[in-house]
């Protein structure tokens, strides 16, 4: 209940900041975005705090179903100057000093979703070899980004290969090079650990395997974003791979990256402490968020794992039953 909407809120904030609100709402009209539609909800409001700084935005619908910004405010220690009735955000181009800090925050998080692993999906397709500055949100430039690591940060690539081998025993190593037929394109080629005479590509990997390679690349990259949001990274992963995923997530957090993960995986939850977990429940037609209290669960955790407490409905985060 509401986990994906929480991630989608940050996507919407990014859309607003990047001045793509008009195009976004042409595909996602107000009737779909607003809580129970326009009859129930008249405005969509967001408020984010970053230390002494804050950002507020109020979206209102037009007659054609698109949205405009009814109010936008950047705050510093509670004071701010609102801008009203604009088509796109002013923050990105603002010359106001306080907005420099706000821009840094709004640019600091990246949202990733590696759900689509179908034939012809970005994760299984060739990539432009020059599209390699950062891993794209859908993993579409994965081979180009790995190739850049091979050339610029080979130790990182070796580390990624080592972790991938732990999750995919038949994986030997990557064989990354631009296509001899089109030097601007590159495929995700790899070799089998027991059969090195043939090269394979992303289409020879299972859905879970190609997702795991993307996740390992994301979490082990040398220059992590300040914040990463991932929606259900456990999809299609073997339990052993979920354990490795949890380890990489903790390692990324230790390197100063804030991770916001939505999950339905008991196995993934088992690798974390109560204070790491926020449950989402539906109450009175809306989603409510609550961080677990470790002291309140201390007695239970003597005999049960955190995941077991979840499945036994001892903690929140349960499906809504009618």
What are these model-derived regions, one by one?
Residues 158-220, 227-243:
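Conserved ABC ATPase signature
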């Amino acid at each position: 209940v509401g986990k994906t909407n929480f991630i989608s809120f940050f996507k919407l904030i990014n859309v607003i900041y990047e001045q793509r609100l008009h195009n976004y709402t042409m595909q996602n009209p107000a009737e779909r975005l607003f809580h129970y539609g326009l009859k129930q909800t008249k405005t969509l409001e967001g408020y984010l705090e970053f230390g002494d700084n804050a950002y507020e935005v109020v979206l209102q619908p037009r007659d054609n179903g698109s949205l405009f910004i009814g109010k936008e405010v950047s705050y510093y220690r509670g004071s701010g100057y609102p801008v009203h009735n604009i088509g796109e955000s002013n923050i990105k181009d603002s010359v106001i000093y306080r907005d420099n800090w706000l821009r840094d925050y709004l640019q600091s998080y990246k949202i990733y979703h590696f759900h689509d692993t179908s034939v012809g999906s970005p994760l299984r397709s060739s990539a432009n070899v020059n599209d390699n500055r950062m891993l794209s949100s859908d993993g579409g430039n994965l081979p180009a980004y790995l190739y850049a690591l091979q050339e610029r940060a080979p130790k990182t690539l070796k580390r990624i290969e080592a972790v991938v081998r732990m999750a995919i025993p038949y994986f030997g190593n990557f064989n990354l090079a631009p296509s001899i037929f089109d030097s601007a394109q590159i495929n995700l080629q790899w070799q089998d650990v027991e059969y090195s005479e043939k090269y394979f590509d992303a289409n020879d990997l299972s859905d879970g395997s190609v997702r795991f390679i993307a996740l390992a690349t994301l979490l082990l990259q040398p220059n992590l974003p300040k914040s990463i949001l991932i929606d259900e990274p456990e999809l299609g992963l073997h339990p052993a791979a979920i354990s490795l995923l949890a380890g990489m997530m903790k390692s990324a957090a230790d390197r100063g990256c804030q991770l916001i993960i939505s999950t339905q995986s008991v196995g993934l939850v088992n690798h974390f402490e109560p204070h790491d977990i926020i449950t989402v429940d539906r109450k009175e037609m809306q989603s409510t968020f609550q961080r677990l209290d470790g002291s309140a669960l201390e007695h239970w955790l003597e005999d049960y794992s955190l995941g077991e407490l979840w499945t036994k409905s001892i903690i929140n985060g349960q499906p809504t039953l009618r």
